[in-house]
Amino acid sequence: MEHITVLLQEAVDGLAIRPDGIYVDGTFGRGGHSRLILQQLGPQGRLYAIDRDPQAVAVAKEWQDPRFEIISGPFSSLHEYMAERGLLGKVDGLLLDLGVSSPQLDEAERGFSFMNDGPLDMRMDPLHGESAAEWLLHADVDDIAWVLRTYGEERFANRIARAIVADRVTTPYTRTRQLAEMIARVVPNKEKHKHPATRSFQALRIHVNQELKEIEETLKASLSVLAPGGRLAVISFHSLEDRIVKQFIRQQEKGIQPPRGLPITEDQIRKTQTLHSVGKAIKPADSEVSDNVRSRSSVLRVAERLGG
């Protein structure tokens, strides 16, 4: 399936692009958001894109635009990337699209999906870290169950984990379809239009790539890289991601909440308020969902950096 960028116009509109501004696309993917940002930048504008997927980086390196630079690595290193370029506190907008791109899902060799059989890998960067198959080969049954329950909200986590550990003695799980078929056997299929393995595959992908930790670290880093008035736009694809983003923005809006009785003034509290939420959460229109079913769970949140 061709990759269709989700909430494309809405996310870029949320950045309130200035032609001479400095912007960061923290998740280049196949370049949908970056392309639209560049269209709105003037000759003095700059766009830095980040991705740890070698295939995405290869696509970006083909772009011939002096205003654009691709950075290879995890977006959680945002602070370091901008510090190296002397851009701390100077970025006018940061965009994070937390979804897995369609090429990643559709390419069987990447091991993200059970729709096509492939090696059980799931790494965003296949050159580093431990694959899903490698982890399942040695992980404790309780650890596997915790990952499935916490990151996939899987009700039958214990049952699946026990089956994995029992089977791996003679037949380790190394293929996507092999794992999906086992899950389909042990989990009741009560959700229409959703494969029983969907939640488990999400959980394993999040664990293998440390996705939630990456998001938390990047959101914290946004405070040091954004200029006063700079925008943060984040597209989430499931409740775990969106909860982190929503709570982060809410916490930064409130600032410190001292225990009652401490002699802290309203002005002192105001100085710790770093973000202001811009509008309400945005979901894709029905027309977008009908054109791209993978957009149905997406949510966009936008916030503005205070200060100045």
UniProtKB/Swiss-Prot annotation:
Q: Which GO terms describe its molecular function?
A: rRNA (cytosine-N4-)-methyltransferase activity
Name of this chain's protein? Ribosomal RNA small subunit methyltransferase H
Compartments where found: Cytoplasm
Q: Has UniProt tagged this entry with the keyword Transferase?
A: yes
Q: What is the lineage of its organism?
A: Bacteria, Pseudomonadati, Pseudomonadota, Gammaproteobacteria, Aeromonadales
Q: Where is the signal peptide?
A: none
Which InterPro entries does the annotation name? RsmH, SAM-dep_MeTrfase_MraW_recog, SAM-dependent_MTases_sf
Family as reported in the entry's similarity comment: Belongs to the methyltransferase superfamily. RsmH family.
Q: Which GO terms describe its cellular component?
A: cytoplasm
Is the Cytoplasm keyword given for this protein? Answer: yes
| GO BP annotations listed | rRNA base methylation
What are the entry keywords? Cytoplasm, Methyltransferase, rRNA processing, S-adenosyl-L-methionine, Transferase
User: Which residues does S-adenosyl-L-methionine bind?
Assistant: 31-33, 51, 75, 97, 104
Its EC number is 2.1.1.199
Q: What function is annotated for this protein?
A: Specifically methylates the N4 position of cytidine in position 1402 (C1402) of 16S rRNA.
Q: Which NCBIfam families match?
A: 16S rRNA (cytosine(1402)-N(4))-methyltransferase RsmH
**Catalysis performed (reactions):** cytidine(1402) in 16S rRNA + S-adenosyl-L-methionine = N(4)-methylcytidine(1402) in 16S rRNA + S-adenosyl-L-homocysteine + H(+)
Origin species: Tolumonas auensis (strain DSM 9187 / NBRC 110442 / TA 4)
- Principal EC category: transferase
